[in-house]
């Protein structure tokens, strides 16, 4: 728990997502997980990890809201929605996900929705009322980074069309700081992290690296990268060059 606390501090995160489980809230020393989290500093985001049906995801979301309402945490109406398709890939069930979004939005939730990198599915989730869409870079916990850059770019384009402030967060598959930087350079508003830090040889150092990758990627996006071209463009002027130029 202390390692988790130090890693969170190193990352400078503002939101912590927590899976809702039927487990004891206290560890063997009688301490609660929440004792290690500064509730005035962090917003707690309950998630429905492990749910394979829309019905289960809705029930878990409501349980999470009840818990956070007792803590007066601003994330009480938030839920990170996951409706998984199978245990092997942990890829989302698109039909169940959409059903759960519609139900939870009607129930007053601000839904931050995990989905695949399919731009059409992402757009339908937004149209159903999700507060944020979270396309996967690659399968959960795989560490493969952003496998399909084009699809993430299309998701960003569709979701932010006429709505540039709509939050798009790359969720799942991140393995290292360069993955975070790439996601932010593409224009994502944030990246969800867990395994890449928790399973790193030095989680605290990796959390530092992820923060720097996030900052660098965002600054690069805002600065505006040069366009990619097939041929070279000399960075120094050719006029006055003391050399023979082939073909001229």
Predicted regions and their residues:
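Alpha/beta enzyme core
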Residues: 1-15, 28-43, 52-171, 175-195, ...
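A short beta-strand-loop structural module common to alpha/beta enzyme folds
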Residues: 14-22
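Short, motif-level signal for alpha-helix interfacial/capping segments enriched in acidic residues
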Residues: 25
């Amino acid at each position: 728990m202390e390692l988790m606390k130090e890693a969170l501090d190193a990352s400078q995160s503002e939101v912590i997502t927590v899976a809702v489980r039927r487990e004891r809230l206290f560890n063997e020393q009688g301490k609660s997980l929440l004792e290690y989290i500064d509730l005035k500093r962090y917003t707690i985001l309950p998630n429905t990890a492990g749910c394979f049906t829309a019905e289960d995801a809705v029930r878990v979301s409501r349980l999470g809201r009840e818990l956070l309402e007792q803590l007066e945490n601003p994330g009480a109406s938030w839920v990170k929605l996951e409706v998984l398709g199978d245990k092997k890939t942990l890829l989302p069930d698109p039909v169940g996900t959409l059903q759960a979004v519609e139900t939870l939005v009607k129930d007053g939730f601000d839904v931050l929705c995990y989905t695949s990198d399919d731009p059409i599915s992402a757009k339908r989730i937004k149209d159903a009322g999700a507060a944020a869409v979270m396309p996967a870079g690659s399968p959960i916990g795989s560490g493969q980074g952003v496998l399909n850059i084009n699809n993430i770019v299309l998701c960003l384009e569709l979701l932010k069309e006429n709505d540039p402030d709509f939050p798009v967060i790359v969720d799942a598959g991140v393995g290292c700081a360069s993955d975070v930087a790439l996601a932010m350079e593409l224009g994502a508003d944030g990246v969800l992290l867990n395994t890449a830090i928790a399973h790193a040889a030095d989680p605290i150092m990796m959390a530092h690296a992820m923060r720097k990758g996030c900052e660098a990627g965002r600054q690069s996006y805002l600065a505006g990268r040069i366009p990619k071209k097939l041929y070279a463009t000399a960075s120094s002027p050719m006029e006055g060059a003391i050399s023979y130029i082939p073909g001229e």
